[in-house]
């Protein structure tokens, strides 16, 4: 998923009524927690479900959920959404992943031959999930964006792999060994990125516990806001569509996004892509799926732009003007 590489096309110059909603930075600490997610650095040992449960316990919320399960022995980047934020975890459902893996070959390998095979494995590959897998063992295609040798020491290699969601790193290393004719197995694995989110911005469970304690004990939420990101950040990998105030409540009720409701949007995006709906104050409304591509949206005056799949903003945050054909709000009027 591309991040930060899209242009913004303005369809309609329009302001937003300050009486409705609020910028994410204006939320109280309690509201910030309920509409947040974090980039967690999962340690080796616990399951991803256990880690999400600990987040829920630390923050005292009713639910927390993760995206992209990591096996107990695997460490690294694990996005975890909190409370209401779990409703839009699907924003990361197609997120590509980057791993650093340690592979052990069962025989000696030539470094140039290894690099050649790594190059050959880039692109579209066929994979069948391993025996111990939570999904049905069907042959499927996955894309390997890059496969790089970082270090070779005897029969041990350090590899960096950038892969499509749902790619099994362990199986990829097994296949690498088979192609080389010596066999190989994975000895260690760390996930260093999920789409735009890297280990550089990941926090630990201890960071989270400390931040929450400082807020509860001293009333200082500065650290808490650094550890817990506003839920709007979860949409970082997706094209954004900013909608008029008059369209917000309709989307909150699950209606599709119609062209007259669009104020501006990021492009390019294609039909079928996930898109994120935002208010003009920068609040995340929900996630939809584009019914047309961005070039068509530029010219559209009527018709449907996207189907609404998930909503995070509560109904009634903005008035239901869509029921009575509400007027737009102009800046300075």
From Swiss-Prot:
For this protein, the Enzyme Commission number is 5.4.99.25
Broad enzyme group: isomerase
UniProt catalytic activity: uridine(55) in tRNA = pseudouridine(55) in tRNA
Keyword field contains tRNA processing:
yes
Q: Tell me, what is one Gene Ontology molecular-function annotation carried by this entry?
A: RNA binding
Regions that span the bilayer: none
- Domain (PUA) spans 238-313
UniProt-listed Gene3D superfamilies: Pseudouridine synthase, PUA domain
NCBIfam families documented for this protein:
CBF5 (TIGR00425), PRK04270.1 (NF003280), unchar_dom_2 (TIGR00451)
Family per UniProt?
Belongs to the pseudouridine synthase TruB family. Type 2 subfamily.
Spell out the protein name for this chain: Probable tRNA pseudouridine synthase B
| Naturally occurring in which organism (per UniProt) | Pyrobaculum calidifontis (strain DSM 21063 / JCM 11548 / VA1)
Q: Which gene encodes it?
A: truB
């Amino acid at each position: 998923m591309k991040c930060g590489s899209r242009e913004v096309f303005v369809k309609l110059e329009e302001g937003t009524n300050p009486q409705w909603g609020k910028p994410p930075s204006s939320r109280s600490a309690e509201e910030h927690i309920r509409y947040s997610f974090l980039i967690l650095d999962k340690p080796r040992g616990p399951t991803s479900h256990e880690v999400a449960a600990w987040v829920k316990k630390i923050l005292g919320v009713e639910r927390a959920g993760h995206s992209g399960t990591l096996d107990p022995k695997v460490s690294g980047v694990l996005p975890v959404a909190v409370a209401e934020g779990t409703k839009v975890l699907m924003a990361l459902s197609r997120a590509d992943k980057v791993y650093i893996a340690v592979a052990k070959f069962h025989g000696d390998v030539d470094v140039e031959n290894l690099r050649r095979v790594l190059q050959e494995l880039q692109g579209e590959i066929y994979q069948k999930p391993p025996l111990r897998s939570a999904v049905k063992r069907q042959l499927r295609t996955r894309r390997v964006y890059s496969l790089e040798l970082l270090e070779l020491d005897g029969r041990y290699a350090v590899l960096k792999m950038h892969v499509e969601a749902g790619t099994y790193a362990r199986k990829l290393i097994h296949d690498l060994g088979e192609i080389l004719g010596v066999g190989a197995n994975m000895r260690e694995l760390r996930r260093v990125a999920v789409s735009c989110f890297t280990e550089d911005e990941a926090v630990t469970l201890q960071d989270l516990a400390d931040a929450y304690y400082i807020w509860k004990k001293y009333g200082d939420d500065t650290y808490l806001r650094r550890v817990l990101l506003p839920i709007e950040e979860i949409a970082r990998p997706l094209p954004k569509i900013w909608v008029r105030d008059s369209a917000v409540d309709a989307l909150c009720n699950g209606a599709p996004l119609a062209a007259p409701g669009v104020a501006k949007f990021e492009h390019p995006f294609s039909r079928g892509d996930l898109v994120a709906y935002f208010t003009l104050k920068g609040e995340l409304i929900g996630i939809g799926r584009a019914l047309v591509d961005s070039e068509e949206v530029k010219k559209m005056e009527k018709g449907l732009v996207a189907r609404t799949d998930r909503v995070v903003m509560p109904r009634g945050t903005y008035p239901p003007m869509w029921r009575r054909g509400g007027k737009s709000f102009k800046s300075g009027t």
